[in-house]
Amino acid sequence: MFFSQPTHLAKAEELKQAPPKGVAYSVALPGTEQPGRSPVYRAWNAQKELLTTLDPEVTTAHDIFESTAIRHPKNDCLGWRPYNSTTKSFDPYQWLTYETVQKRRAAFGAGIVELHHKHDCHRPGQYGVGLWSQNRPEWQITDLACVSQSLYSVSIYDVLSEDATEYIINHSELSCVVTSLPHIASLIKLKPSLPTLKIIISLDPLDGGEQAGHSKRAIFESMAAGLGLAIYTIDQVEELGLASKRGYNPPSASDIVTINYTSGTTGPPKGVVLTHGNAVAATSCGLITISQARGDTSASYLPLAHIYARLAEHTAFWGAARIGYFHGNIAELVDDLKLLKPTGFMSVPRLYSRFGSAIRAATVEQPGFKGALSRHIIAAKTANMKNPDPSKATVRHALYDRIWAKKVTAALGLERARYMVSGSAPLDPTLHNFLRVATGTDVLQGYGLTESYASATAQPVYDLTAGNCGSLAPCVEACLVSLPDMEYSVDDKPFPRGELLLRGNNMFREYYKNEEETRSAITEDGWFRTGDVCTIDEKGRFIIIDRRKNVLKLAQGEYISPERLEGVVLSELGYIAQAYVHGDSLQTFLVGIFGVAPDLFAPYASKVLGRTIAPTDLEAVKESLNDDKVRRAVLRDLERVAKKHKFAGYERIRNVSLKVEPFTVENNLLTPTLKLKRPPTVKVYRSLLDQLYEQAVEEQSAPKAKL
């Protein structure tokens, strides 16, 4: 049977095309420059008007899902791997169809409203519903249920501390939190500090045929007795909604779709107010970048409390793709991918770095014929990719992809993937190009923030450069503003440099109940200050070069961007899994605290020390970290990396401390999105940092033996 392409997908394909010869990807609009500010830039195909939606009939996240559910009711929608208590393992994927999800979300949404009426916490207009769970089908069913009734979700990271959870629930005045089993006891414990909370809805069953008083429900209700807290399961609420006969209460484009709390690297989380219009504009651009269609499969494992993952799932829904959720253990993600065989993959540089290290270890670093063949293939494909004629440049090879790259991608479960997308942090150019040629896949880098619904720039598939995050999405415009204190100017040559400002249909409304932060972040003429320092090349590609907020000043007056240095170290030294570069204003050089990846560090330490250290022997790995031979070997590697990347003398790291996982969410040094919290890190490791400086000074002043 012949199926015509839906209007929105046809429009996406049209907007995906390359610009005419001689036209940049992002174009400066004539006459828009101001003193200290660059011209306004827009996508080449959005110069007259910014994109709002690919389909005028679709203006909300509710519409995105509903339109696909009506068009493709029998298609697979959400999948999961059930836990098998007999085998103590996870079974193959099971799937809910779009029709089933549509019915469940309608019933659940109606039931949530009924509960708010029942417990006297219903409010006129919009109100929020808390969502605290790891990725799973019910997470998405809850979010879809909320938008079906013009409610909005307030997502809470699954690994968030109790203090941060308490802050978010109180700040957003939640009466109801939908959560998974592990968090119910925490909510009951926090209830005395949560005056607005009245309803907990469990995504997991609470009754399993136990004798009276012995079920999970009985235990939780006993704990909650006298606290004014009612506990339900999702099944109960769906039944309540079904019985109510309550229909949809669909939202409008200007309504709130979610309040997404930022990770809070320097203070309490900020509630980013995002609208349905923001969601549709960003999703439209997502479909332009990566294309989705019936039969496609998406893997869900990045935290759905992060807007990057939310955008990925909106895009899958509008493309009628199916979404398979990982079984909960990120260390076993590849097992899920091998079953899912996703047609695309969205991730972050940290995971791509691990992929790159694993691929190198299994191919180009192998001895003998296998290693030689792999190096030849990588060299040949790299030459093809860098062909000076753009029309002939390609990451694909008819023979080598079939006999070699297919095995590489199959080992990761990505043999069907047409694309890989990297976001949330810069992707090292060397790693970027290696992944392209090793997998024969379009590897695209993008840039976005919570405030931009994760969408701002993205590399088009026809551009094979690295070291940039692509051109503007057609829903947003940008400009740069000079930063004299950091010596960045929009008049710099050959390209303007300055802080990146964004404005457009995807941009957030405000910070919830925080006028001061909103006024600080948004200019009077509507531009959002990203805090990222950027340059724009001749093709209209955006390159992040610095971060305004995370700049150190050393004793000699030199400014340092530690995040840039950390990114280079992480990309160059595969055995380093975490990096913190520190500069003291009273010192003239840098020191660092690095977390190692035991599986990759053990062979390295074995070689340095001349004895075998098993990757599984964590005690032996930790012992090696304290060996001065190992420290000095790592310092030599850091010096080599510094020379390769032409670091200035004051940018070179003069001393290090090596640890296994020094920064975690649990010790409050990482945000739930695994971003380093710099001020708390300094506080926790103040004594160690002082010792590193003392040791480095002693070693520098010690007399050197003459040869």
Curated annotation (Swiss-Prot):
Q: Where in the cell is it found?
A: Peroxisome matrix
What GO CC annotations are associated with the protein?
Answer: endoplasmic reticulum; membrane; peroxisomal matrix
**From its record, what is one biological process in GO terms?**
terpenoid biosynthetic process
Residues reported to bind ATP: I259, N260, Y261, T262, S263, G264, T265, T266, G267, P268, P269, K270
Q: Which reaction does it catalyse?
A: (4E,8E)-10-(4-hydroxy-6-methoxy-7-methyl-3-oxo-1,3-dihydro-2-benzofuran-5-yl)-4,8-dimethyldeca-4,8-dienoate + ATP + CoA = (4E,8E)-10-(4-hydroxy-6-methoxy-7-methyl-3-oxo-1,3-dihydro-2-benzofuran-5-yl)-4,8-dimethyldeca-4,8-dienoyl-CoA + AMP + diphosphate
Q: Which PROSITE patterns match?
A: AMP_BINDING
Top enzyme class: ligase
Where do the record's region annotations for Fatty acid-binding lie? Answer: 525-549
Instruction: Give one GO term, molecular function aspect.
Output: ligase activity
Q: Which UniProt keywords apply?
A: ATP-binding, Ligase, Nucleotide-binding, Peroxisome
Keyword Chaperone among UniProt keywords = no
User: Which InterPro entries does UniProt cross-reference here?
Assistant: AMP-binding_CS (IPR020845), AMP-dep_synth/lig_dom (IPR000873), ANL_N_sf (IPR042099)
* Biological pathway: Secondary metabolite biosynthesis; terpenoid biosynthesis
Query: Where, by residue number, is the motif Peroxisome targeting signal?
Result: 705-707
Q: What is its EC number?
A: 6.2.1.-
* Family recorded in the similarity comment: Belongs to the ATP-dependent AMP-binding enzyme family.
Instruction: Note the PANTHER family from the entry.
Output: AMP-BINDING DOMAIN-CONTAINING PROTEIN-RELATED (PTHR43272:SF33), LONG-CHAIN-FATTY-ACID--COA LIGASE (PTHR43272)
Function recorded in the entry = Acyl-CoA ligase involved in the biosynthesis of mycophenolic acid (MPA), the first isolated antibiotic natural product in the world obtained from a culture of Penicillium brevicompactum in 1893. The peroxisomal acyl-CoA ligase 891 converts the intermediate MFDHMP-3C into MFDHMP-3C-CoA which impairs its diffusion from the peroxisome. The first step of the pathway is the synthesis of 5-methylorsellinic acid (5MOA) by the cytosolic polyketide synthase mpaC.
Name of the featured protein? Acyl-CoA ligase 891, peroxisomal
**UniProt source species:** Penicillium roqueforti (strain FM164)
